[in-house]
Amino acid sequence: MVRIVRSCLQSMLKLVNSLIGMVGIAMILYAVWLIRQWQEQMGNLPFADSDHPVPWFIYSFLGLGAILCVVTCAGHIAAETVNGCCLYLYMGFIVLLTMVEGGVVADIFLNRDWKKDFPEDPSGAFHQFSKFIESNFKICKWIGLSIVCVQGLSVLIAMLLKALGPHPHRHYDSDDEYNVSTVALLQDARQPPPYVVGEPMYGAKPGAWTVRLMKGQTGER
């Protein structure tokens, strides 16, 4: 029963983790599109040295998308191995991302002048993004809340997997995870058969005098 529950939780964590990875890939693609737009307008890449201010919005989207993809890979490894260290590392990354995203989302939804909290973006992408949020406020609100809920669900599933522990046939972190019947069979297989050390038991050998008497009796007959 525990094995079935563990397998279901592993599949659920991989599924939820894949959704986080899809969000990261979408952010990277959007950042690449913004880089393309910047190159068409300015004639060079935003990473090249220039006199223009740093396009922080493009950098932020690209970096956050890459971080989400790395966290997704770590989550798949943690879900497959059910290793305690990997699960703790994965949960730590997700909690940090959730705190940052939750702070940004709360500032956008609760503060009417949230644009003033961000620096000026020379690429103009931040202005377009803010206009899109204002025109589709309800949709963006539910999308943001869904992303935060998915990340929270991934942390909950990871905690349940850590409580169940790894598969018994893969890892033995403690003596309690050993199967008693398996250990007994292994001990029987490795234990040599019992034997008794002592002098060999042979029949009494006839002496030379006895042999002569027997030969003499045979000759008389």
Swiss-Prot record:
Disulfide bonds: none annotated. Expressed in rosette leaves. It is found in: Membrane; Vacuole membrane. It comes from the Eukaryota. The keyword Transmembrane applies. Residues 1-14, 75-88, 162-221 are cytoplasmic. It is a multi-pass membrane protein. The chain crosses the membrane at residues 15-35, 54-74, 89-109, 141-161. Pfam families: Tetraspanin. The modification Phosphoserine is found at residue 174. Keywords: Membrane, Phosphoprotein, Transmembrane, Transmembrane helix, Vacuole. Disruption phenotype: Slightly reduced efficiency of intracellular multiplication of tobamoviruses (e.g. crucifer strain TMV-Cg), characterized by a reduced amplification of TMV-related RNAs. Residues 36-53, 110-140 are extracellular. One of its GO terms (cellular component) is vacuolar membrane. Belongs to the tetraspanin (TM4SF) family. Homodimer. Constituent of tobamovirus replication complex. May be involved in the regulation of cell differentiation. Promotes intracellular multiplication of tobamoviruses, probably being a component of the replication complex. This is Tetraspanin-19. It comes from Arabidopsis thaliana (Mouse-ear cress).
